[in-house]
Amino acid sequence: MYKTKGGFQLTLQTLSLVVGFMAWSIIAPLMPFIKQDVNVTEGQISIILAIPVILGSVLRVPFGYLTNIVGAKWVFFTSFIVLLFPIFFLSQAQTPGMLMASGFFLGVGGAIFSVGVTSVPKYFPKEKVGLANGIYGMGNIGTAVSSFLAPPIAGIIGWQTTVRSYLIIIALFALIMFIFGDTQERKIKVPLMAQMKTLSKNYKLYYLSYWYFITFGAFVAFGIFLPNYLVNHFGIDKVDAGIRSGVFIALATFLRPIGGILGDKFNAVKVLMIDFVVMIIGAIILGISDHIALFTVGCLTISICAGIGNGLIFKLVPSYFSNEAGSANGIVSMMGGLGGFFPPLVITYVANLTGSSHLAFIFLAVFGCIALFTMRHLYQKEYGSLKNG
């Protein structure tokens, strides 16, 4: 795989996704440091942490479409140039408003996810798409890189200088993509409105979007709220909290290709149903945990299932929507991103209302149960009885 042109582009785009996600997620692991210099309330913190998800989700639809029109090279390159501005602005932030504004435009780093999942399948045969997209999805590890490295570096050189150091990395990858990006990538120029009309009539798009809303939403949400949550609720050291959050993110990321492989080898919908059953159990564990050990078990369970689930879903998307892949990838990945926006806000609201966050995790279990019913419906329409496939 890696000796081919596709293998090279897969590697390049995966590394580009790493950098994009590093930028997208930079605020969360540094928030314990930022709030020492910027006067912010817990309510404002939850909003600041969630805001990058908005643009990072909404832009996934046009980014996926544009990738089919102009190619991944130019969408990645332009995104990196744009990211330089909010990164610098964040390093100068002195008010909650400045943090929110910079965080909003950092969403560009999250939006580039739909670029690769649209471009990468063009280089591989159908039976390898699940694995290829799973490998590309490992670029999510950029979130873990920020969680692992940003806090200890900030402890040495300060959070502002840590943020500015990202400017070098992003500028470097803009140059690399400009030089090595594929200008010969196959273009698919189906009119956007025609694609949307076709997609809007296909119930599978709604189901896949909802499932990804849960799996990728959990991945994003836990990465956002865990550092601050662990410090505030369990009294964990800031650096240790960043490392624990990084473990959650890394585990989910490395298991994503496993989900793709399972989807290539077995019936992806049936495997996804098993995955969601285990995720529901993990959510229930979180809903009853008051001790850090039990909370850790619940988090790791969610991490495993979110990672495998993400890989399985993006095995299904290109197989169901080959002619509208760019727009379908954009819509599904947008819903996944939005799935990461609401949980931190809900957790904060529930904690303020009840004095505990337990009920918020039970909501995740309920959402998972609803997803199981939709999976059963799709499976029976596509394959008949669950005993088949």
From Swiss-Prot:
CC terms in the record's Gene Ontology section: plasma membrane
Protein family membership: Belongs to the major facilitator superfamily. Nitrate/nitrite porter (TC 2.A.1.8) family.
Induction context: Positively regulated by the two-component system NreB/NreC.
Regions that span the bilayer: 14-34, 45-65, 69-89, 97-117, 139-159, 161-181, 211-231, 246-266, 268-288, 294-314, 331-351, 353-373
InterPro entries according to UniProt: MFS (IPR011701), MFS_dom (IPR020846), MFS_trans_sf (IPR036259), NO3_transporter (IPR044772)
UniProt keyword list: Cell membrane, Membrane, Nitrate assimilation, Transmembrane, Transmembrane helix, Transport
Its biological purpose: Probably required for nitrate uptake under anoxic conditions. Also possibly involved in excretion of nitrite produced by the dissimilatory reduction of nitrate.
GO molecular function: nitrate transmembrane transporter activity
Name of the protein in question: Probable nitrate transporter NarT
GO biological process: nitrate assimilation
Membrane topology: Multi-pass membrane protein
Subcellular location: Cell membrane
One Pfam family cited in the UniProt record for this chain: MFS_1
